[in-house]
């Protein structure tokens, strides 16, 4: 079995690749706009994105990396940009993204709904595309090679245009790393 990991942050790259190793024999990592970590996957794809382009415009590159890898399962770090890329990939594959996966048991996954108040077990039919936080996997270790391939940028037919950006200070805790949340 082969797993395809799409992640932005270095922590998520390491955690999701380690977790993917527990459910698959081969792990492939794809990163848009930033160098992929080495030593965490069997192969890594650096999906190019020109300066000033929004990440969403790299969807064709992510799809090219997916097609090159031919994976059985896709694990996606649940960031806003990656969720869009996952949705676009799933649409091309004729399937849907299963969000907020917390556990894997063979082909059955457990995911949260109602804002995490309830859990649901389901089995994907067709291509498997899941958003999952790195904390869903216990103390797994990431292993791999330094093999990195660059996927050239392909401009979309109808590209998003970035009109401006504004720095927003980072505040609050990362709830995916908390053991207990009281609220």
Annotated model-derived regions:
Residues 1-183:
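N-terminal glycine-rich FAD/FM-binding segment characteristic of electron-transfer flavoproteins
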């Amino acid at each position: 079995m082969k797993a395809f990991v799409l992640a932005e942050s270095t922590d998520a790259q390491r955690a999701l690749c380690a977790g993917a190793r527990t459910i698959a024999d081969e792990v492939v990592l794809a990163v848009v706009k930033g160098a992929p970590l080495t030593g965490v996957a069997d192969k890594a794809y650096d999906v190019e994105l020109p300066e000033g382009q929004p990440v969403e415009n790299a969807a064709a590159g992510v799809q090219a990396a997916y097609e090159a890898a031919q994976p059985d399962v896709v694990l996606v770090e649940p960031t806003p940009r990656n969720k869009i890329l996952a949705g676009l990939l799933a649409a091309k594959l004729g399937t849907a993204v299963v969000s907020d996966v917390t556990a894997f048991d063979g082909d059955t996954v457990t995911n949260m709904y109602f804002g995490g108040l309830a859990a649901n077990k389901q089995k994907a039919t067709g291509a498997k595309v899941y958003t999952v936080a790195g904390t869903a996997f216990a103390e797994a270790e990431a292993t791999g090679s330094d093999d990195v391939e660059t996927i050239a940028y392909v401009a979309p037919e109808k590209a998003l245009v970035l009109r401006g950006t504004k720095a927003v200070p980072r505040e609050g805790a990362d709830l995916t790393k908390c053991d207990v949340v009281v609220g």
